[in-house]
């Protein structure tokens, strides 16, 4: 596998594995995602998990579209979100525009290392190694 083209070896798609999380509350699938300016961005469609540590690393947030048509997907590092006290929704620590202008993710193409790096850099985070 060439550098920058394949997925980080220890991240797996939670929807496509029987892996369980060390902390079950980290399964954020289905939760609505809001921005700091209270605008709804979308919802968590999937979670990428560190296979060895069994911890959530990246959220796949789906936004827009009608019946799946025109839907866009964005990756958000879990460090960028906070869960409300009732646990029913997440807030990204940025305005809605910041998230919707982030590098777009195509679930059909899978998670590639170069996109992961771009997402972590976009949010000012270090790429995990």
Map each language-model feature to its residues:
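Peripheral interaction segments used for macromolecular assembly
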Residues: 1-129
């Amino acid at each position: 596998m060439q550098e920058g083209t394949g997925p980080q070896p220890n991240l797996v798609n939670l929807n496509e594995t029987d892996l369980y999380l060390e902390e079950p509350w980290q399964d954020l699938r289905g939760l609505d995602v809001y921005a700091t300016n209270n605008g709804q961005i979308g919802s968590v469609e999937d979670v990428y998990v560190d296979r060895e540590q069994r911890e959530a690393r990246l959220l796949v947030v789906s936004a827009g579209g009608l019946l799946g048509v025109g839907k866009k997907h964005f990756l958000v590092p879990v460090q960028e979100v906070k869960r409300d006290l009732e646990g029913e929704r997440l807030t990204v620590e940025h305005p809605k525009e910041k998230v919707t202008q982030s590098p777009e993710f195509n679930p059909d193409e899978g998670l590639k290392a170069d996109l992961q790096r771009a997402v972590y850099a976009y949010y000012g985070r270090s790429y995990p190694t």
